Regions:
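Active-site neighborhoods and metal-handling regions in enzymes and metal-associated proteins
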Residues: 1-260
Length: 260
């Protein structure tokens, strides 16, 4: 069942989203060669709690850490540990925050130091795809319009969409209806209506789209070892257009659409 929210609830989700954005920027500022992903997770946990929030991922279906940190060929759900971040890596910070009963979710892939041109293009295309998806998140459109817009940008650039992973409703719960795939036909799927809040999140690879699940039951990586990127915003569907509830702070963003 799709849960539609009123203005006050959307504002609460937006406040949670503001803390999500601040957390991503705060953790991003600590990413450097030599730091461990567990150290970054601790930074995130302490930052969120110091501002009255709770890391939504921690304990969710047994997940053991505060946030997800996915490096290089890991697409999503990387569990922070003692692994050391290296220069030239791609590091995705995926943060969910619960604040005053509202939940927001966002992700951002950082480059660690200097990366090659093709890796940078992967990041740029993923952000472009997110922007294209958000632009279609308007009253009267359908989920398929978002999905198709993302797919066109990604595949048009020669990259692959991970079809087994997708966005979702969010707000009262971490994962709500509807599913928001990153591929599909325009004009198909549930119609977008006022008060829907959804996480739009292209997850793309430089190589093939297939992925595999690690023995830890969480980490999902590319089957061919190719690099992956993941950008995500929580978005509200409103009469004036899509409202990004997790607007970026302190990091470059190509996906500003609608009301910040």
């Amino acid at each position: 069942m799709i849960i539609r929210k009123g203005p006050a609830e959307i504002d609460r989700i937006g406040r949670a989203g503001g803390l999500v954005a601040e957390t991503i920027a705060h953790v991003g500022g600590r990413i450097e060669p030599g730091v461990t992903t567990l150290e970054l997770d601790t930074v995130a946990d302490e930052f969120i709690r110091s501002r009255g929030g709770v890391p939504t991922s921690q304990g969710y279906k047994g997940y053991p850490r505060a946030i997800c940190i996915s490096v290089d060929d890991v697409v999503v759900h990387g569990i922070p540990d003692e692994a050391v971040v290296e220069g030239g890596s791609l590091v995705t910070i995926d943060v969910g925050v619960t604040l005053d009963g509202a939940i927001a979710d966002s992700a951002y892939t950082f480059a660690v130091g200097t990366i090659d041109a093709e890796s940078q293009r992967l990041l740029d295309v993923c952000q472009d795809a997110l922007a294209a998806g958000i632009a279609e998140a308007r009253l009267g459109n359908r989920i398929g319009d978002i999905s198709h817009a993302v797919q066109v940008v990604v595949e048009g650039a020669g990259f692959s969409v991970v079809k087994s992973l997708m966005g979702h409703g969010v707000g009262r719960h971490y994962h709500e209806d509807p599913h928001v795939p990153n591929f599909g036909e325009a004009g198909r799927g549930p119609r977008l209506s006022e008060g829907m809040t959804i996480a739009i999140e292209p997850m793309i690879t430089m190589g093939r789209p297939e992925v595999w699940l690690a023995e830890d039951g969480w980490t999902i990586a590319t089957s061919d070892g190719s690099l992956a990127a993941h950008f995500e915003h929580t978005v509200a569907i409103l009469p004036g257009g899509p409202r990004i509830l997790t607007p970026r702070v302190g990091v470059p963003d190509l996906s500003r659409t609608g009301t910040p």
